[in-house]
């Protein structure tokens, strides 16, 4: 267990390097290069962006090895890739391929309706989505080195990401005021290990990096998530479904860097072209955020 714990600390440290940055979904070597040139701290290699997964339906699986390898060979920044929730074999394949990070993602069709992957068994670090503190701490207990809001991917609508980030931050604030016996009871209530709740109380935050994701479509959206306490931002469909991906990618990076400077935010929000068309979350037939437990 000590070896696993030590390895987790190293994985967690790797994720810390992404703080204050943008991680972009890409589906080709060309898109990966655009992301790198714009200043992305990493890219997420995909066959289809979430908006297309949502539109086309069917079973969404790990991207093809050829696609991921093409993207890995195109850039020098870290490359992440998604696996289905609970799909141990997909994760082992990606680890063997040499990706830098794995996202056990609700954007893909879950492979296991009872268990997430035991991430301690892998050398490669994992990022997982969460809607609240209980979900975040369950994933960390399984070995996740990084957390992100689930939001509602592929919608271009930031409302769910805002809801999830606010909920986590509010719950953390509550935890910092609790006595130990209250932490024990709260851990049972939200399904979280009390040891991790004690760590949250001590730190006043999650014990790992916490990014925003799901529905970020404009530089203003990205800045908003930073204002709410995110350590950085994942942008999925928002860049390459916009009218001018190069401009949008650069603007997203600048917005995350200068989130607390309205003058700069105004400047970078001008002349970036049309953002992706958004969807009303209330009208969705499939809510990806509800996948996972």
Curated annotation (Swiss-Prot):
Instruction: Name a single GO biological process.
Output: pyridoxal phosphate biosynthetic process
Q: Where is the active site?
A: 82
This one is known as: Pyridoxal 5'-phosphate synthase subunit PdxS
Chemical reaction(s) catalysed: aldehydo-D-ribose 5-phosphate + D-glyceraldehyde 3-phosphate + L-glutamine = pyridoxal 5'-phosphate + L-glutamate + phosphate + 3 H2O + H(+)
Q: What are the entry keywords? A: Lyase, Pyridoxal phosphate, Schiff base
Q: Which residues bind D-ribulose 5-phosphate?
A: 103
Give binding positions for D-ribose 5-phosphate.
25, 154, 215, 236-237
Cysteine pairings via disulfide bonds? none
Its source organism is Thermotoga maritima (strain ATCC 43589 / DSM 3109 / JCM 10099 / NBRC 100826 / MSB8)
Q: What does this protein do?
A: Catalyzes the formation of pyridoxal 5'-phosphate from ribose 5-phosphate (RBP), glyceraldehyde 3-phosphate (G3P) and ammonia. The ammonia is provided by the PdxT subunit. Can also use ribulose 5-phosphate and dihydroxyacetone phosphate as substrates, resulting from enzyme-catalyzed isomerization of RBP and G3P, respectively.
Q: In which pathway does it act?
A: Cofactor biosynthesis; pyridoxal 5'-phosphate biosynthesis
Domain of life of the organism in this record? Bacteria
Q: Which residues bind D-glyceraldehyde 3-phosphate?
A: 166
Per its UniProt record, what InterPro entries does this chain match?
A: Aldolase_TIM (IPR013785), PdxS/SNZ (IPR001852), PdxS/SNZ_N (IPR033755), RibuloseP-bd_barrel (IPR011060)
């Amino acid at each position: 267990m000590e070896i696993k714990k030590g390895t987790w600390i190293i994985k967690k440290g790797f994720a810390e390097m992404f703080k204050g940055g943008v991680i972009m979904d890409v589906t080709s070597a060309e898109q990966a290069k655009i992301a790198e040139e714009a200043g992305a701290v990493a890219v997420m290699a995909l066959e289809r962006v979430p908006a297309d997964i949502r539109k086309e339906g069917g079973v969404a699986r790990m991207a093809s090895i050829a696609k991921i390898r093409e993207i890995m060979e195109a850039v020098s920044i870290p490359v992440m890739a998604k696996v289905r929730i609970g799909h141990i074999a997909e994760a082992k394949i990606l680890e063997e391929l040499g990706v830098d990070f794995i996202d056990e993602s609700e954007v893909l069709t879950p492979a296991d309706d009872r268990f997430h992957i035991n991430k301690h068994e892998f050398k490669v670090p994992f990022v997982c989505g969460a809607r609240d503190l209980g979900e975040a701490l369950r994933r960390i207990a399984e070995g996740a080195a990084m957390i992100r809001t689930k939001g509602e991917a592929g919608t271009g609508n930031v409302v769910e990401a805002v809801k999830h980030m606010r909920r986590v931050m509010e719950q953390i604030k509550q935890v910092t005021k609790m006595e130990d016996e209250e932490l024990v009871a709260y851990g049972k209530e939200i399904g979280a290990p009390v040891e991790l709740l004690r760590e949250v109380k001590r730190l006043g935050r999650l014990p790992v990096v916490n990014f925003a994701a799901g529905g970020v479509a404009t530089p203003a959206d990205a800045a908003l998530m930073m204002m709410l306490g995110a350590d950085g931002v994942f942008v999925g469909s928002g860049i390459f479904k916009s009218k001018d991906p190069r401009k949008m990618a650069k603007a997203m990076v600048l917005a995350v860097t200068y989130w607390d400077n309205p003058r700069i935010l105004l400047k970078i929000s001008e002349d970036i072209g049309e953002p992706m068309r958004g969807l009303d979350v209330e009208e969705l037939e499939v809510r990806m955020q509800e996948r996972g437990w």
